[in-house]
Amino acid sequence: MRSVPEDFTTLISDLETFLTDVLKGENLSKKAKEKKDAFIKRIKDVKTSYAQEFKDRRDEEFPEPDEADTNDGGSLHSEQTDRDDENAYDGVQQSPPVAAQDLQAVLKSGYLEKRRKDHSFFGNEWQKRWCALNNSIFYYYGSEKDKQQKGEFNIVGYTVKMNNTLRKDAKRDCCFEVSAPDKRVYQFCAASEKEAKEWVEHIDFLIKDLGGIIPEDEEEYDDCLSMSQSEVAILPDDDIYEELPEEDVPQPSKPKVTLVNKPPPPATPVTAAVNKSTDYANYFQGLWDCIGDQPDELSFKRGDTIYILSKEYDMFGWWVGEMKGVIGIVPKEYLLELYVL
Protein backbone atom coordinates (compact mmCIF):
# COMPACT_ATOMS: atom_id res chain seq x y z
CA MET A 1 0.00 0.00 0.00
CA ARG A 2 1.32 3.41 -0.94
CA SER A 3 2.37 5.49 2.09
CA VAL A 4 0.55 8.71 2.91
CA PRO A 5 2.66 11.92 2.90
CA GLU A 6 3.32 13.35 6.35
CA ASP A 7 1.93 16.76 5.36
CA PHE A 8 -1.35 15.08 4.48
CA THR A 9 -1.62 13.24 7.80
CA THR A 10 -0.85 16.47 9.68
CA LEU A 11 -3.55 18.33 7.73
CA ILE A 12 -6.12 15.62 8.47
CA SER A 13 -5.25 15.66 12.19
CA ASP A 14 -5.54 19.46 12.37
CA LEU A 15 -8.85 19.33 10.52
CA GLU A 16 -10.07 16.72 12.99
CA THR A 17 -9.11 18.98 15.90
CA PHE A 18 -10.95 21.89 14.31
CA LEU A 19 -14.15 19.90 13.82
CA THR A 20 -14.21 18.13 17.18
CA ASP A 21 -12.79 20.85 19.46
CA VAL A 22 -13.01 24.32 17.94
CA LEU A 23 -16.53 23.90 16.52
CA LYS A 24 -17.67 21.98 19.58
CA GLY A 25 -19.05 25.01 21.39
CA GLU A 26 -20.29 26.90 18.34
CA ASN A 27 -24.00 27.43 17.70
CA LEU A 28 -24.30 25.77 14.30
CA SER A 29 -27.36 25.41 12.12
CA LYS A 30 -28.85 21.97 11.57
CA LYS A 31 -27.39 21.77 8.08
CA ALA A 32 -23.93 22.82 9.29
CA LYS A 33 -24.02 20.19 12.06
CA GLU A 34 -24.89 17.51 9.50
CA LYS A 35 -21.94 18.57 7.34
CA LYS A 36 -19.63 18.57 10.37
CA ASP A 37 -20.74 15.08 11.41
CA ALA A 38 -20.24 13.81 7.87
CA PHE A 39 -16.68 15.18 7.75
CA ILE A 40 -15.88 13.63 11.14
CA LYS A 41 -17.12 10.24 9.91
CA ARG A 42 -15.07 10.49 6.70
CA ILE A 43 -11.93 11.43 8.66
CA LYS A 44 -12.50 8.49 10.97
CA ASP A 45 -12.82 6.14 7.99
CA VAL A 46 -9.65 7.49 6.37
CA LYS A 47 -7.61 7.16 9.56
CA THR A 48 -8.89 3.62 10.04
CA SER A 49 -7.88 2.68 6.49
CA TYR A 50 -4.38 4.13 6.97
CA ALA A 51 -3.85 3.15 10.60
CA GLN A 52 -0.10 2.64 10.13
CA GLU A 53 0.45 6.14 8.72
CA PHE A 54 -1.71 7.95 11.25
CA LYS A 55 -0.60 8.24 14.84
CA ASP A 56 -3.99 8.87 16.29
CA ARG A 57 -3.58 10.74 19.59
CA ARG A 58 -7.14 9.99 20.55
CA ASP A 59 -6.93 6.25 19.77
CA GLU A 60 -10.05 6.67 17.62
CA GLU A 61 -12.11 7.76 20.63
CA PHE A 62 -14.13 10.52 18.98
CA PRO A 63 -16.58 12.52 21.10
CA GLU A 64 -20.19 12.52 20.06
CA PRO A 65 -20.83 15.46 17.69
CA ASP A 66 -23.61 16.93 19.83
CA GLU A 67 -21.98 16.26 23.20
CA ALA A 68 -22.47 19.05 25.70
CA ASP A 69 -19.48 21.35 26.02
CA THR A 70 -18.21 21.06 29.60
CA ASN A 71 -14.92 22.78 28.82
CA ASP A 72 -14.14 26.47 28.42
CA GLY A 73 -13.02 26.26 24.79
CA GLY A 74 -10.15 23.76 24.79
CA SER A 75 -10.13 19.97 24.69
CA LEU A 76 -9.20 17.75 27.63
CA HIS A 77 -6.03 16.93 25.77
CA SER A 78 -5.10 20.59 25.36
CA GLU A 79 -5.78 21.27 29.05
CA GLN A 80 -3.45 18.46 30.08
CA THR A 81 -0.87 19.80 27.64
CA ASP A 82 -1.24 23.21 29.27
CA ARG A 83 -0.18 21.72 32.62
CA ASP A 84 2.54 19.53 31.07
CA ASP A 85 4.09 22.58 29.39
CA GLU A 86 4.63 24.13 32.83
CA ASN A 87 6.62 21.16 34.12
CA ALA A 88 8.61 20.65 30.96
CA TYR A 89 9.62 24.29 30.67
CA ASP A 90 10.41 25.24 34.26
CA GLY A 91 11.99 21.92 35.18
CA VAL A 92 10.61 22.05 38.74
CA GLN A 93 7.82 20.31 40.58
CA GLN A 94 4.57 22.24 40.72
CA SER A 95 3.01 23.54 43.92
CA PRO A 96 0.59 21.22 45.72
CA PRO A 97 -2.95 21.21 44.31
CA VAL A 98 -5.21 23.81 45.88
CA ALA A 99 -8.88 24.49 45.18
CA ALA A 100 -9.74 27.94 43.87
CA GLN A 101 -12.16 28.56 46.74
CA ASP A 102 -9.51 27.60 49.32
CA LEU A 103 -7.15 30.43 48.40
CA GLN A 104 -6.70 32.98 51.18
CA ALA A 105 -5.74 36.66 51.03
CA VAL A 106 -6.32 37.00 47.27
CA LEU A 107 -5.12 40.40 46.03
CA LYS A 108 -6.78 40.18 42.60
CA SER A 109 -8.92 37.58 40.84
CA GLY A 110 -11.13 37.17 37.80
CA TYR A 111 -11.43 35.63 34.36
CA LEU A 112 -8.70 36.20 31.78
CA GLU A 113 -7.79 34.66 28.46
CA LYS A 114 -4.40 32.95 28.73
CA ARG A 115 -2.30 32.48 25.63
CA ARG A 116 -1.00 28.94 25.17
CA LYS A 117 2.72 28.50 24.67
CA ASP A 118 2.18 25.90 21.95
CA HIS A 119 -0.91 25.46 19.80
CA SER A 120 -1.73 23.84 16.48
CA PHE A 121 -3.03 25.66 13.44
CA PHE A 122 -6.64 24.88 14.27
CA GLY A 123 -6.14 24.71 18.03
CA ASN A 124 -7.24 27.37 20.47
CA GLU A 125 -4.53 29.99 20.94
CA TRP A 126 -6.34 31.66 23.85
CA GLN A 127 -7.98 29.76 26.69
CA LYS A 128 -10.37 31.20 29.24
CA ARG A 129 -8.94 30.88 32.73
CA TRP A 130 -9.98 32.01 36.21
CA CYS A 131 -6.85 33.67 37.61
CA ALA A 132 -5.95 34.62 41.16
CA LEU A 133 -3.02 36.59 42.58
CA ASN A 134 -2.30 35.06 45.98
CA ASN A 135 0.73 36.37 47.88
CA SER A 136 3.61 35.79 45.44
CA ILE A 137 1.87 33.06 43.39
CA PHE A 138 -0.20 33.63 40.25
CA TYR A 139 -2.70 30.73 39.93
CA TYR A 140 -4.90 29.94 36.94
CA TYR A 141 -7.88 27.56 36.88
CA GLY A 142 -10.52 26.43 34.40
CA SER A 143 -13.15 28.10 36.61
CA GLU A 144 -13.50 29.52 40.10
CA LYS A 145 -15.00 26.17 41.22
CA ASP A 146 -12.04 24.00 40.20
CA LYS A 147 -10.55 21.77 42.89
CA GLN A 148 -7.05 22.00 41.42
CA GLN A 149 -5.14 24.65 39.50
CA LYS A 150 -4.13 24.09 35.88
CA GLY A 151 -0.89 25.90 36.57
CA GLU A 152 0.85 28.59 38.61
CA PHE A 153 4.06 30.58 38.77
CA ASN A 154 5.92 32.70 41.30
CA ILE A 155 5.95 36.36 40.23
CA VAL A 156 9.17 37.17 42.11
CA GLY A 157 11.80 38.21 39.56
CA TYR A 158 9.20 38.93 36.88
CA THR A 159 8.10 42.22 35.34
CA VAL A 160 4.67 43.07 33.96
CA LYS A 161 3.60 45.42 31.18
CA MET A 162 0.80 46.08 28.70
CA ASN A 163 1.33 44.60 25.23
CA ASN A 164 -0.90 45.57 22.30
CA THR A 165 0.91 43.38 19.77
CA LEU A 166 -0.45 40.03 20.95
CA ARG A 167 -3.76 40.30 19.13
CA LYS A 168 -5.04 42.09 16.06
CA ASP A 169 -8.73 42.13 16.94
CA ALA A 170 -10.75 44.51 19.11
CA LYS A 171 -8.99 43.24 22.24
CA ARG A 172 -5.49 44.23 21.18
CA ASP A 173 -5.39 46.95 23.87
CA CYS A 174 -6.60 44.54 26.57
CA CYS A 175 -3.47 42.36 26.67
CA PHE A 176 -0.55 42.25 29.08
CA GLU A 177 2.39 39.94 29.69
CA VAL A 178 4.46 38.80 32.66
CA SER A 179 8.07 38.00 31.75
CA ALA A 180 11.54 37.43 33.18
CA PRO A 181 14.95 36.58 31.67
CA ASP A 182 15.41 32.84 30.98
CA LYS A 183 11.86 32.10 32.12
CA ARG A 184 8.58 31.42 30.41
CA VAL A 185 6.58 34.44 29.26
CA TYR A 186 2.95 34.46 30.39
CA GLN A 187 0.51 36.43 28.22
CA PHE A 188 -3.07 37.30 29.14
CA CYS A 189 -6.03 39.19 27.73
CA ALA A 190 -8.68 40.87 29.89
CA ALA A 191 -12.27 41.74 29.05
CA SER A 192 -11.42 45.44 28.79
CA GLU A 193 -8.42 47.75 28.71
CA LYS A 194 -9.33 49.07 32.16
CA GLU A 195 -9.38 45.55 33.61
CA ALA A 196 -6.00 44.76 32.03
CA LYS A 197 -4.45 47.91 33.51
CA GLU A 198 -5.81 46.97 36.95
CA TRP A 199 -4.12 43.57 36.70
CA VAL A 200 -0.85 45.21 35.64
CA GLU A 201 -1.08 47.70 38.52
CA HIS A 202 -1.73 45.02 41.14
CA ILE A 203 0.95 42.63 39.86
CA ASP A 204 3.53 45.42 39.55
CA PHE A 205 2.79 46.71 43.05
CA LEU A 206 3.10 43.22 44.54
CA ILE A 207 6.36 42.50 42.68
CA LYS A 208 7.90 45.71 44.02
CA ASP A 209 6.49 45.11 47.49
CA LEU A 210 7.96 41.60 47.64
CA GLY A 211 11.28 42.92 46.41
CA GLY A 212 11.28 45.81 48.87
CA ILE A 213 11.55 48.39 46.08
CA ILE A 214 8.29 50.32 46.39
CA PRO A 215 9.30 53.73 44.97
CA GLU A 216 9.06 56.89 46.99
CA ASP A 217 6.62 59.60 45.93
CA GLU A 218 7.34 60.85 42.43
CA GLU A 219 6.62 64.23 40.91
CA GLU A 220 3.21 63.11 39.69
CA TYR A 221 2.12 62.74 43.34
CA ASP A 222 3.26 66.20 44.43
CA ASP A 223 -0.36 67.21 44.88
CA CYS A 224 -0.61 64.70 47.72
CA LEU A 225 1.71 66.62 50.03
CA SER A 226 0.10 67.88 53.20
CA MET A 227 -1.55 71.28 53.02
CA SER A 228 0.75 72.64 55.68
CA GLN A 229 3.80 71.98 53.48
CA SER A 230 2.13 73.63 50.50
CA GLU A 231 1.24 76.62 52.64
CA VAL A 232 4.82 77.07 53.84
CA ALA A 233 6.02 77.08 50.25
CA ILE A 234 3.82 80.05 49.27
CA LEU A 235 4.18 82.16 52.42
CA PRO A 236 7.15 84.23 51.11
CA ASP A 237 5.10 85.33 48.08
CA ASP A 238 2.41 86.87 50.28
CA ASP A 239 4.59 89.97 50.78
CA ILE A 240 3.97 90.96 47.16
CA TYR A 241 0.31 91.65 47.89
CA GLU A 242 0.71 93.65 51.11
CA GLU A 243 0.81 97.08 49.42
CA LEU A 244 -2.74 98.02 48.44
CA PRO A 245 -3.85 101.27 46.75
CA GLU A 246 -6.64 101.90 49.26
CA GLU A 247 -6.47 101.43 53.03
CA ASP A 248 -10.14 100.51 53.39
CA VAL A 249 -9.77 97.42 51.19
CA PRO A 250 -9.57 94.39 53.54
CA GLN A 251 -6.59 92.07 53.38
CA PRO A 252 -7.38 88.69 51.79
CA SER A 253 -7.57 85.95 54.42
CA LYS A 254 -5.09 83.08 54.23
CA PRO A 255 -6.50 79.64 53.53
CA LYS A 256 -6.91 77.41 56.54
CA VAL A 257 -4.63 74.46 56.95
CA THR A 258 -7.35 72.08 58.14
CA LEU A 259 -9.82 70.59 55.69
CA VAL A 260 -13.30 72.09 55.65
CA ASN A 261 -15.03 68.72 55.87
CA LYS A 262 -12.79 67.25 58.56
CA PRO A 263 -14.90 65.39 61.17
CA PRO A 264 -14.63 65.98 64.90
CA PRO A 265 -11.87 64.06 66.69
CA PRO A 266 -12.88 60.45 67.33
CA ALA A 267 -14.02 59.55 70.80
CA THR A 268 -12.73 56.54 72.66
CA PRO A 269 -11.11 54.24 70.07
CA VAL A 270 -13.52 51.68 68.73
CA THR A 271 -12.46 48.12 69.51
CA ALA A 272 -12.97 45.67 66.68
CA ALA A 273 -15.57 42.97 67.34
CA VAL A 274 -14.02 40.64 64.77
CA ASN A 275 -10.77 38.75 64.48
CA LYS A 276 -8.31 41.09 62.78
CA SER A 277 -6.25 38.22 61.44
CA THR A 278 -9.13 37.14 59.18
CA ASP A 279 -10.94 40.47 58.68
CA TYR A 280 -9.38 41.02 55.23
CA ALA A 281 -12.11 43.44 54.08
CA ASN A 282 -10.90 46.15 56.48
CA TYR A 283 -7.22 45.99 55.56
CA PHE A 284 -6.03 48.83 53.31
CA GLN A 285 -2.67 50.09 52.07
CA GLY A 286 -1.42 53.62 51.56
CA LEU A 287 -1.42 54.90 47.98
CA TRP A 288 0.80 57.89 48.81
CA ASP A 289 2.66 59.36 51.77
CA CYS A 290 0.35 61.21 54.15
CA ILE A 291 1.63 63.43 56.98
CA GLY A 292 -0.95 64.27 59.63
CA ASP A 293 -1.39 67.97 60.38
CA GLN A 294 -3.17 67.42 63.71
CA PRO A 295 -2.58 65.02 66.65
CA ASP A 296 -5.74 63.05 65.80
CA GLU A 297 -4.57 62.37 62.21
CA LEU A 298 -2.66 59.19 61.40
CA SER A 299 0.58 59.59 59.42
CA PHE A 300 1.62 56.81 57.02
CA LYS A 301 3.71 56.12 53.94
CA ARG A 302 2.90 54.57 50.62
CA GLY A 303 2.59 50.81 50.98
CA ASP A 304 1.91 50.87 54.74
CA THR A 305 -0.83 48.50 55.92
CA ILE A 306 -3.69 50.17 57.81
CA TYR A 307 -6.55 48.37 59.58
CA ILE A 308 -9.81 50.34 59.46
CA LEU A 309 -11.62 50.30 62.80
CA SER A 310 -14.57 52.45 61.80
CA LYS A 311 -16.08 54.19 58.76
CA GLU A 312 -18.26 56.42 60.93
CA TYR A 313 -17.04 59.58 59.21
CA ASP A 314 -17.30 58.22 55.66
CA MET A 315 -19.54 61.12 54.62
CA PHE A 316 -16.68 63.50 55.49
CA GLY A 317 -14.14 61.45 53.53
CA TRP A 318 -12.36 60.18 56.66
CA TRP A 319 -12.07 56.79 58.38
CA VAL A 320 -10.71 55.72 61.75
CA GLY A 321 -7.66 53.52 61.24
CA GLU A 322 -4.96 51.76 63.21
CA MET A 323 -1.32 51.21 62.23
CA LYS A 324 1.32 49.68 64.49
CA GLY A 325 -0.86 50.26 67.56
CA VAL A 326 -1.50 53.95 66.77
CA ILE A 327 -5.10 55.03 66.12
CA GLY A 328 -6.17 58.11 64.18
CA ILE A 329 -8.32 59.37 61.34
CA VAL A 330 -7.15 58.84 57.75
CA PRO A 331 -8.38 60.28 54.40
CA LYS A 332 -10.00 57.39 52.54
CA GLU A 333 -8.87 58.76 49.14
CA TYR A 334 -5.31 57.92 50.14
CA LEU A 335 -6.12 54.22 50.66
CA LEU A 336 -6.42 51.14 48.43
CA GLU A 337 -7.91 47.78 49.36
CA LEU A 338 -5.13 45.40 50.35
CA TYR A 339 -7.08 42.24 49.48
CA VAL A 340 -9.69 41.50 46.81
CA LEU A 341 -12.25 39.11 48.29
From Swiss-Prot:
Superkingdom of origin organism: Eukaryota
Domain PH: 105-208
Pfam families (alphabetical): PH, SH3_1
Region (Disordered), start-end ranges: 54-95, 246-265
Gene Ontology CC: cytoplasm; plasma membrane
Keyword line: B-cell activation, Cytoplasm, Phosphoprotein, SH3 domain
Record's comment on post-translational modification: Phosphorylated on tyrosines.
InterPro entries, per the entry: PH-like_dom_sf (IPR011993), PH_domain (IPR001849), SH3-like_dom_sf (IPR036028), SH3_domain (IPR001452), SKAP_fam (IPR037781)
Ranges for domain SH3: 279-340
Comp. bias regions, Acidic residues: 61-70
SUPFAM superfamilies: PH domain-like (SSF50729), SH3-domain (SSF50044)
Chief location bin: cytoplasm
SMART domains, A to Z: PH, SH3
GO BP annotation list: B cell activation
Family assignment from sequence similarity: Belongs to the SKAP family.
Task performed by this protein: May be involved in B-cell and macrophage adhesion processes. May play a role in src signaling pathway.
Record's protein name: Src kinase-associated phosphoprotein 2
Organism: Danio rerio (Zebrafish)
